[in-house]
Amino acid sequence: MDYSHRGQQFRLTNNLKYKPEAAAEMEAALHAFRTSPHVVENYKRITNEVRPYPPFITARLQRAAFYLFRFEPDYTMKLAQELYEGVDTPWGRTGMITYPRTDSYHLSDHAVDEMIAILTDHYGEEADEYVLMTKRQFENKTNAQAAHEAIRPTHFSEEYWPGVAQQYLTEDQTRLYEMIFYRTMSTQVRNALYDMSILEVDVGGNKLIGRAYERLFDGWERLDGHRINIAERNDDPNAFKYREVVLPEFDVGDELRPLEITTV
């Protein structure tokens, strides 16, 4: 069901599915949708903060590299080992990432302090709005080796940002390094904020439901969030729920006029 309210078009759905034995029920519902008033029964304004994903451990790194680049796990670890052992740079042979075999989400205080300083400079006047000034904590698995660190860049200063570092790396090394770099940096950026409001409309006893999914503040997602989300949601059977849906605001009792009634 397509509507327009306060200048915003949107669509609501009914869970009624066509079955030959329920044809009469379907016809009655369609008749109600065409002839009965469409009245807002419930509107709940919900905003939800979305945290960044934790820094990479080995298994998550392999999974993300496969989803984004179709790298096989062994190839991902070969590239990661090369980045760990070091590449030739103008200031000598330099390890680009920490040890790539780990099951810990821990980041050292020194690394976090460096990230905060670099991000504060990167965001400039927006730093207070974007940069998390205290260390974000991620819970390890009970058997994780907490003394180890997650997979992260060894340094975060300008010469180590992917756009600069790529001149010292192969194409595939750059892909993996960039993914690790932004994933790590995003952990010290504030949460994204989404409108996830719920709308229920009554039409002659039939219920139509809509759920918003609109980003209000990008937060950590500004740092390559699109690719980070793709890597994490690729195997989510409910990935469709992340498509943007914008709903206007409503008052209970508002009467809506449908623009189009369709059946699938």
Each model region followed by its residue ranges:
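Core catalytic DNA strand-manipulation module of type IA topoisomerases
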Residues: M1-V264
